[in-house]
Swiss-Prot record:
One of its GO terms (molecular function) is tRNA binding. This is Small ribosomal subunit protein uS7. It comes from the Bacteria. Part of the 30S ribosomal subunit. Contacts proteins S9 and S11. GO terms for biological process: translation. One of the primary rRNA binding proteins, it binds directly to 16S rRNA where it nucleates assembly of the head domain of the 30S subunit. Is located at the subunit interface close to the decoding center, probably blocks exit of the E-site tRNA. PROSITE patterns: RIBOSOMAL_S7. PANTHER family: RIBOSOMAL PROTEIN S7. NCBIfam families: rpsG_bact. It comes from Sodalis glossinidius (strain morsitans). The lineage of its organism: Bacteria, Pseudomonadati, Pseudomonadota, Gammaproteobacteria, Enterobacterales. The gene is rpsG. Keywords: Ribonucleoprotein, Ribosomal protein, RNA-binding, rRNA-binding, tRNA-binding. CDD domains: uS7_Bacteria. InterPro entries: Ribosomal_uS7, Ribosomal_uS7_bac/org-type, Ribosomal_uS7_CS, Ribosomal_uS7_dom, Ribosomal_uS7_dom_sf.
Length: 156
């Protein structure tokens, strides 16, 4: 960790088709082995399918799905006097987006549909309707934080 100065976060270029930085980040999270064009093709196909199903715009439908998966609180381990407590802490906005996107991609990869684009479209549409694996993950994290509310005073 540098002591002299805080290094700023690298600026991410917006995605070429929709001009959205959030979508560009999503493509980067989905990308495997540096194959960005493949990841972009998968995301754009999935968004096309999602837009047809929901009747909303591509970005709007994506934003709704992402909104339903974003966590507000999570638990972090904190060691106090020989025992470890799961302390609920609020999630920073950047991490909220990152976790939501990661959970959607993980859930889509575990699905059994034919193509990745179809799996991603199905997971996004499930997330938009407040169901599916990614939303369940968020609810589990929230439940965990709620169960450990008693240790909130150990926050740092």
């Amino acid at each position: 960790m540098p002591r002299r100065r805080v290094i700023g976060q690298r600026k991410i270029l917006p995605d070429p088709k929709f001009g959205s930085e959030l979508l560009a980040k999503f493509v980067n999270i989905l990308m495997v082995d540096g194959k960005k064009s493949t990841a972009e093709a998968i995301v754009y196909t999935a968004l096309e399918t999602l837009a047809q199903r929901s009747g909303k715009g591509h970005l709007e439908a994506f934003e709704v799905a992402l909104d339903n998966v974003r966590p507000t609180v999570e638990v972090k381990s904190r060691r106090v006097g020989g025992s470890t407590y799961q302390v609920p802490v609020e999630v920073r906005p950047v991490r909220r987006n990152a976790l939501a996107m990661r959970w959607i991609v993980e859930a889509a990869r575990k699905r059994g549909d034919k193509s990745m684009a179809l799996r991603l479209a199905n997971e996004l549409s499930d997330a938009a309707e407040n169901k599916g694996t990614a939303v369940k993950k968020r609810e589990d994290v929230h439940r965990m934080a709620d169960a450990n509310k008693a240790f909130a005073h150990y926050r740092w």
